[in-house]
């Protein structure tokens, strides 16, 4: 993974030398806020300047590159916002770099714009899918960790001691696999949900709140990907459950398995 991380850093830096970056954070819940926060941290750490995307602004198809925030928004049949945004704006930019994502469907978008896209996948199922659309590894499709792993974790910590036993943080939305009610549940990812994350201060404060909540617990039970990632980064015991499609297990297999031994994936019975 170190080599892939290096390629991720270097590729963005190589484009940055001769192009202006225009960043559009992925809309969504507080997990998408974590992705945005980590992206801002990544930009700062690598001295990558950018401007936020704004409706009505004029962009150059010669010099501007759209950086589309990663995540799980490009899932045909579940979410359309990311697809529609890219479809409506791709002609304004020299390239569109899709930050680490899980992608399902929307084949026409990717086939018809193969010369415009550089796609970073965050797990192998998406990587294999994008390759099947004639994208070439190390040219216009890459694989790396979810952006949350690029978070500058220390600046979000409260360092409060652990004094609570376990937190249940299960989905209460359409990505829940079972829809079952969980006792004493805290779906903290839904504290915010919308197109908010171009505001880096809001993104970071939301992320800080999620981390500060999780810091107090010894065990975290969740089917929320970014709750599982944050809890793993914090060294918690994590029981990680499937969502309604392959995303959770695929990211677990690529980025969490064998790296965070206190995180276990609980397969559906």
Language-model regions: role of each:
Residues 1-269:
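Active-site anion-handling motifs in enzyme catalytic cores
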